[in-house]
Amino acid sequence: MQPGKVSNRSRYLTLLLIGLLAGFSTSQRLLAHHTDSHFEDSSKHRIVYQLNKADPAYLQHVLFSAGELMRKYGDDVEIVIGALGPGLHLIGKLPGHPIPTELQQRASSLAQYGVAFHACGNTMKSLGWEEKDLLPFAKIVPIGIDDIMQLQEQGFTYISW
């Protein structure tokens, strides 16, 4: 080969390298675009239930629905049950409404599988309840409906009966 001339092989390797780098760069931009418009884990489902009644049949339906989603999606679903108003009694140690023990046990079981139970702080104040009055898996939020709104703004699907 003469000095100053580039071989066909060198030219081919250079073009191949440029093509690979351009393809990699484009694919990274496409991936970045995809993740910018989705949650960190785009396959995860997010549900927030509003639990605002103490009726045992109603509580049964909500807990059954949450359990079915857990069975179907396992780790691919994040569930929050926002308890406010009379619904708060489900997660109270000494509920003021007649709540069947089996429903509290079911709520406890769901909590062990990752279902979060948020207790409305305003409702707690109106009942004269403190943190010690709740079952251990419950998390207090200042305003229950505000918590539900914020979860919706984070992409949670709102479910209410």
What are these regions (language model features)?
Residues 3, 20-21, 42:
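Short N-terminal alpha-helical targeting/association segments
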Residues 3-15:
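Bacterial N-terminal signal peptides that target proteins for export
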Residues 14-25:
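Bacterial N-terminal signal peptides
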Residues 30-161:
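Secreted/extracellular ectodomain signature
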